[in-house]
């Protein structure tokens, strides 16, 4: 079956924003204008097509990134048909894992900003993730009809806060209630949308006289940015500022956007049906197709570097980036195809796990409606049914040409809670439900506390766990009682402990046990656990050395202070002895474990606690209350700045997670509900002695 749309006409984009910048509304309008969705779904009444989980509709926030396909021929029907795959990404801090995961499979992103709030804390997190995966982006300043809207302020903030070079390719005509349309700086025409047709119809008009000077000033800046794309253009531009043609300007801006040097900037009001189609045109004009992105690198099964080019001729390779449980078809695995072609019914290799599986049906999604398709090709995003083994981050590829694309790295959870089923009947269902949810979301972990037998769930924040418990109830019908949130402490050591021995000997007639290991333990900040074999002269036979390492790794799960996991330690195995008859793997595993426990006691063990980067936006009158409250929570204030547009202050602080429980309630009462905050994990830091004493005694009781 030949390709319907050439790969050059594909755009895989994410729409990313801070909560309430209007991202879901923007996506809805895209679906409306591209003719997929006939009635515009409003988030205000909870009917948005992309937000397809019940809780999202209640909370009005987007949680799971749904992938949707739309087609676009340009606002004026002046392009050949392009295929735009949109991945909707959440804008809430507890869901950064979702954003990170979708960034990995995007070729370009559209950053949506609120014209009043501008660049907010979460926007910075998303921007950093886009930088990490080198995703080219355009910016859309939404809600230009709101009181206090200021397009140029947002342009400045992108430079100051995000260090991005924002190049407006439009400027707004009017703002707030008088927002009518935009001036297209490339065509130097005004675009005015018609309200009757919900913005489907529009007209090109002359630039209003009162904006002529401003439009020329910003066009000059835009053309200058375009001219820097090449020596030839720069010379042509310097010779005559007006000599660059519309096509030359677009091609040059495209080149610089794809190189991540500039961010073209547009504006509009999705809610008022203005500006969204021009943004779609910009997606086609400036964001890359899969063919514009360099070949993707990976490793074959022998760890040799391998690459795949974005075309149909290379062997099939793809990355699974999301798993969802669907009530009708069971598990859906969303995957992005980087190269080659695959048909439903084909056998694919899960190279990450080295297991072959048969690809059942392939579905293309529109929010949560689905269309079955026979095959997918390079550049496509689709969902597969019938893969049992795949989890997020796995590579699915052609069995004859194995490749492992890079692994996604997921953050460790920082908060945990005990959950107990309310009835005996819920007991079994709960285990099943939790495993399903953990499969979908790698930042969510489930384990059983060995001492108490309780089930412990861990995640990225209170809201994250709250939503998962809620999903358990709705999707799996499991009622559960949730314990108080607990902090995920860690243990480590501060000083080295040299030549500490562990000896496990049981010799009382018959076959005995004999294992003897001598280790040196030292701090290993930020590097995790490291094991070094420094045995000379065969004092411990080769085959027993991995057992010592295994014994130590088992002991790492529970430290000597309060039984928390041990991190950032380096262990060197220096000496030991063995017995010809009595030594075995188990004896050396025990010896390793004993040596490590003793070494840790001697190496000044300390407790580490998760520190959170907290940002509070507050009216100036409540500054004192907010700062005082943060200090009382052992917070270290790291900076303050004015919120642009006279909207109060932004306070940045680092606060231990242990002190942040119930913060939203106390912030509300301290500021009469007028302050907002965001918080995300920053790092682990040593817990002060007086605090760790309390934690240890509470745990040891």
Swiss-Prot record:
Disulfide bond residue pairs: none
Cellular localization per UniProt: Cytoplasm
Keywords: Cytoplasm, Elongation factor, GTP-binding, Nucleotide-binding, Protein biosynthesis
Organism superkingdom: Bacteria
Name this polypeptide is given: Elongation factor G 2
Protein purpose: Catalyzes the GTP-dependent ribosomal translocation step during translation elongation. During this step, the ribosome changes from the pre-translocational (PRE) to the post-translocational (POST) state as the newly formed A-site-bound peptidyl-tRNA and P-site-bound deacylated tRNA move to the P and E sites, respectively. Catalyzes the coordinated movement of the two tRNA molecules, the mRNA and conformational changes in the ribosome.
InterPro entries: EFG_II (IPR041095), EFG_III (IPR009022), EFG_III/V (IPR035647), EFG_IV (IPR047872), EFG_V (IPR035649), EFG_V-like (IPR000640), EFTu-like_2 (IPR004161), G_TR_CS (IPR031157)
NCBIfam families recorded: EF-G (TIGR00484), PRK12740.1-5 (NF009381), small_GTP (TIGR00231)
């Amino acid at each position: 079956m030949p390709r319907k749309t050439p790969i050059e006409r594909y755009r895989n984009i994410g729409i990313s924003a801070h909560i309430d910048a209007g991202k879901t509304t923007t996506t809805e309008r895209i679906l409306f204008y591209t003719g997929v969705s006939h009635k515009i779904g409003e988030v205000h009444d909870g009917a948005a097509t992309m937000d397809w989980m019940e809780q999202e509709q209640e909370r009005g926030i987007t949680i799971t990134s749904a992938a949707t396909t739309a087609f676009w021929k340009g606002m004026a029907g002046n392009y050949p048909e392009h295929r735009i795959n949109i991945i909707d990404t959440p804008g809430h801090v507890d869901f950064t894992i979702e954003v990170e995961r979708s960034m990995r499979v995007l070729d370009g992103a559209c950053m949506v900003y609120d014209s009043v709030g501008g660049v907010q804390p979460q926007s910075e997190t998303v921007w950093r993730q886009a930088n990490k995966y080198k995703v080219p982006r355009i910016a859309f300043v939404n809600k230009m009809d709101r009181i206090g809207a200021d397009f140029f302020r947002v342009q400045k903030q992108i430079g100051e806060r995000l260090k991005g070079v924002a190049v407006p390719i439009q400027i707004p005509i009017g703002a707030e209630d008088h927002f009518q349309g935009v001036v297209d700086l490339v065509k130097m025409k005004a675009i005015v949308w018609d309200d009757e047709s919900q913005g489907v119809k529009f007209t090109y008009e002359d630039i209003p006289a009162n904006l002529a000077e401003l439009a020329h000033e910003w066009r000059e800046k835009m053309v200058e940015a375009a001219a820097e794309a090449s020596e030839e253009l720069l010379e042509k531009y310097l010779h005559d500022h007006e000599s660059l043609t519309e096509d030359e300007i677009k091609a040059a801006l495209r080149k610089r956007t794809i190189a991540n040097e500039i961010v073209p900037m547009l504006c509009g009001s999705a809610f008022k049906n203005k500006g969204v189609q021009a943004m779609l045109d910009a997606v086609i004009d400036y964001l890359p197709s899969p063919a514009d992105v360099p070949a993707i690198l990976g490793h074959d099964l022998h760890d040799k570097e391998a690459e795949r080019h974005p075309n149909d001729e290379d062997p099939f390779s793809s990355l699974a980036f999301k798993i969802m449980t669907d009530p009708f078809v069971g598990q859906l695995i969303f995957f992005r195809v980087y190269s080659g072609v695959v048909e439903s019914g084909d056998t694919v290799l899960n190279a990450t796990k080295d297991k072959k599986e048969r690809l059942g049906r392939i579905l293309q999604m529109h929010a949560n409606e689905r269309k079955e398709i026979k095959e997918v090709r390079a550049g496509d995003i689709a969902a597969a049914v019938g893969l049992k083994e795949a989890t997020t981050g796995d590579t699915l590829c052609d069995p004859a040409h194995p490749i492992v694309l890079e692994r996604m790295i997921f953050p460790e959870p920082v908060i945990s809670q005990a959950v107990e089923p309310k009835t005996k009947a819920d007991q079994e269902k709960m285990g099943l439900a939790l495993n399903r949810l953990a499969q979908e979301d790698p930042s969510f972990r489930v384990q059983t506390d060995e001492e108490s037998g309780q089930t412990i769930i861990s995640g990225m924040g209170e809201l994250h766990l709250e939503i998962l418990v809620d999903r358990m109830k709705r999707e799996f019908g499991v009622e559960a009682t949730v314990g108080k949130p607990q902090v995920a402490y860690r243990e480590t050591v501060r000083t080295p402990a040299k030549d500490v021995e562990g000896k496990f000997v049981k010799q009382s007639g018959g076959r005995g046990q004999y294992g003897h290991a001598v280790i040196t333990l030292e701090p290993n900040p930020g590097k995790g656990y490291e094991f070094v074999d420094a045995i000379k002269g065969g004092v411990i036979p080769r085959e027993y050395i991995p057992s010592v390492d295994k014994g130590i790794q088992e002991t790492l799960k529970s430290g000597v202070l309060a039984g928390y996991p041990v991190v950032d330690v380096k262990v060197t195995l220096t000496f030991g002895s063995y017995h010809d008859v009595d030594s075995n793997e188990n004896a050396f595993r025990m010896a390793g474990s004993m040596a490590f426990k003793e070494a840790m006691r001697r190496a000044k063990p300390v407790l580490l606690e998760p520190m959170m980067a907290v940002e509070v936006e507050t009216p100036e009158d409540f500054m004192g209350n907010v700062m005082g409250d943060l200090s009382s929570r052992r917070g270290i204030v790291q900076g303050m700045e004015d919120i642009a547009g006279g909207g109060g202050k932004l306070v940045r602080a680092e606060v231990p997670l242990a002190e942040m429980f119930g913060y939203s309630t106390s912030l509300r009462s301290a500021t009469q509900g007028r302050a907002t905050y965001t918080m995300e994990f920053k790092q682990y830091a040593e817990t002060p002695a007086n605090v760790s004493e309390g934690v240890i005694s509470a745990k040891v009781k």
